Amino acid sequence: MKNKMWKLLGAALLLMPLAACEQNEAQITAQGEQAELVTAYLDAVDERYAYEIAETLAYDPAYLSNELGFRTAGSDAEHAAARYIADEMEEIGLEVEQVPVTVDRWQFNDASLRLEGTDIDIMPASYATNGTDEDGITAELVDVGSGGAADYAGKDVEGKIVLAGVDQWNEAWIDQYLHEAELHGAAAIITYDTGGYATYSDEMINMQDVCAEDVMPCVSISASQYRQLAEAIEAGNDMATLIVDNEMQEEQGTSYNVVGRLKGRSDEQQIIVSGHYDVYFNGFQDDSCAVGLVLAMAKGMVDSGYQPENDILFIAHGAEEWGASGTQFDWTTGAWEMINNAHPEWAGKTIAMINFELPAFYDGMSQGQISCVPEFSTLTKTFVETSGLLAEPVDAIYPEGISAESVDTNTMEDGVSYRASGVPYFINIPGTQEGEKGWIQQRYHTVADDRDTYSAQVMQTNLNTFGALAIYLDQTPALALDLNATCDDLQEALDTTLAGENAQPYLDALDALRNAAQAHQEEIAAINAQYQDALDEKADQQTLDEIRERGRALNVKTLDAFRFVQEQFIGIISTSDIVIKHVAYQNNVDVIEGVIAALEEGVLSNEEGSGALDLAWMINGGAEYGYYSFSTETNAASLATLQEESNPGNLFWGTDKGSVLAQTYPATVSLLEKAESEDGDFTEEIAVYAKEQAQQERYLQEMIRQETDAMQELTQMLGA
């Protein structure tokens, strides 16, 4: 998992969930055949088994690459872990396959940093970049402060090792620090966190995906280790030897997605239950606990004697954290390869994916949450409020129960790759609180993601909740994927003022689509109601099978429509914000208008945050912010890996999701310079912004027209 914000409890509360749930005493209120199936599963599922799997994956040295941990894309440790997971799946009784997919291989074996004249000997953590030879790099260590362009002024770093403080939460991702060091001729870069991540303590080393070309060794140390180095440099001991034993092989690695199949009565459809098993450090929560949960759910179903209607595939994906060099879309590579190259046919037959990330820590939330694509929000509400299949959270760990209001998914886990190919999905949510006291900023991708964070109650609650959800999905013949939610998103996304004369055709097409979506939803509901009536009347198996066959036929249309929605309407701003495609242009037009208005008033910055430089950073989804601290060359290098024009065939799940960026950066850079010189003439900058705003308006109108045409086509698809 890449980056999301969650809240952590204090240490005392964290200790409470360590005790295992003595027995799963979960109860449900529903009656009937589905209820009996869920009850049998709840009686059989074993939280302790999930913990044992997670602990083994996180701490057994046989499945780790070095003393810091690490199990990365295509590494020996990842291969060993795949075999272990496959063996466990076979022991459970699943049909097992290790599916090979191509990734960039990265194996981090070891690293050391020594300073001459001192006893400093540090083991840094390496990013997914090239290493050194066995002798390493011996060079002067130069402190470049916060690692921005201005920090290199007056410093000769040619052929030297630079030391930079980074904040990847608030300021910039590691690729910009890396490219800035490359621009100035450094031989390697050592980073430490000054804020954002790794706030648990100054002893924490943080690791992230690199989102860049492999240009030089890049490693991370802790803030306390930095202070040792800074004191040594101040004392005149600045000659360092950095050795990084990394094995990097672009497009020559193999990662294994381990699949355990629980065969259904029909193999025409399937459900996927998944987590990923590659890790930074020990990765206890992220994502060893998820693999434990996936296997425990499988074992619970098998042990309960559950016979699914559809195949249920339990999958441990590799190469989620990182799997490809030279792209901003370098995570969830194993999953992307799976659904696009290894098994593209899954896109038309997978009725749902249930993915897991960090599923066993207590976040302090009063209410548990389920995240899903918007089209599953109605199903989630029904499952929580009226199905009677949902057990209460274990030991009231979430005192207000599970929320019926779902949360939209994001791009930070394997579901994004499957969604882009037309697979709708769910994912657990540990919580959504933000801030430096939150779990993500404190422990995420550090050694503090450890077993001390384990909550048996949360693990058991997730096993109960999502196991019941999987059975509910499996037992329901017509997939209740509600395209009314698509219509809601399309309506909410449109600024009718900016859309101008294209607004009414868009809204007319949307009205027609909403009518078709509602009719489709009613057809789904009718089949499911007929099936429930047949169950209540104890109908024979032939009657039930005939209804299920009608449901499967309708599901084909439903999944085709969902895939069409992903292809035609869903865009991604930068790599993080999932939006309706025209919103990228709409936002730019709006922001640039504000920048121009501020410049016409002569205001660069003010307390209200409405000055030109207070706003300009938001252009292109925040990509413009890079110019505030880094050189134009560094920003160009980062953006080159983001866009299809400059990086064709290497955007993975970002393919066809981006937009044409506004070329406003010359004006923004000029404003930053004038802010220092107090030059108040902004005529040239206004001209640049106005030109780019007009271009973004043209792109906006064209995209709105395309979406209007697509709505009409989707209406016809649903009516066929």
PLM region spans:
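Acidic/histidine-rich catalytic neighborhood of metal-dependent amide-processing enzymes
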Residues: 169-176, 257, 279-375
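C-terminal non-catalytic alpha-helical accessory regions
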Residues: 464, 474-720
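Noncatalytic luminal/extracellular "stalk/propeptide" segments of secretory-pathway proteins
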Residues: 48, 52-55, 59-161, 168
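Soluble metallo-hydrolase cores and metallopeptidase-like ectodomains found primarily
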Residues: 36, 119-154, 207-284, 295-307
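C-terminal motif of bacterial Sec signal peptides marking the signal peptidase cleavage site
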Residues: 17-20
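Active-site-adjacent substrate-binding region
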Residues: 359-488, 567
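Extracellular/luminal Protease-associated
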Residues: 125-217, 401-404
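Bacterial signal peptide processing site
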Residues: 22-24
